[in-house]
Curated annotation (Swiss-Prot):
SUPFAM superfamilies: all-alpha NTP pyrophosphatases. InterPro entries: MazG-like_dom (IPR004518), MazG-related_YvdC (IPR011411), YpjD/YvdC (IPR047046). The gene is yvdC. CDD domains: NTP-PPase (cd11523). This is Uncharacterized protein YvdC. It comes from the Bacteria.
Length: 106
């Protein structure tokens, strides 16, 4: 899926459910929640969970969880960017330019 197609799909999906009605402060809260879930998935994948109240998962299940949580983070970033009239393409271009400039003499 191309970035622009993903943005369009996410916007339509979130709008259909009324999830775009939340303001940016609430959206950032959702983003932080999803970032925490991604951190948990990374931990499970890298060092395991060691929790007796959780079932063990296979490496494939752990990787799928990583992918899904990354998607949740990106989805929230895309919706937040859209609130400010910014595309993910714009975000990535600016990020690339910033890093290139910062490290051009390194």
């Amino acid at each position: 899926m191309q970035l622009a197609d993903a943005e369009k799909w996410m916007k339509e999906f979130y709008e259909k459910r009324g999830w775009t009605e939340y303001g940016p402060f609430i959206r950032v809260g959702f983003l932080m929640e999803e970032a925490g879930e991604l951190a948990r998935a990374v931990r499970a994948y890298e060092i395991g969970r060691d929790r007796p109240d959780e079932k063990e998962s296979s490496r494939a299940e752990q990787k799928q969880e990583l992918i899904e949580e990354m998607g949740d983070v990106i989805g929230n970033i895309a919706i937040l960017a859209d609130m400010y009239g910014v595309s993910l393409e714009d975000v990535m271009k600016a990020h690339q330019e910033k890093l290139t400039k910062r490290f051009e003499h390194a």
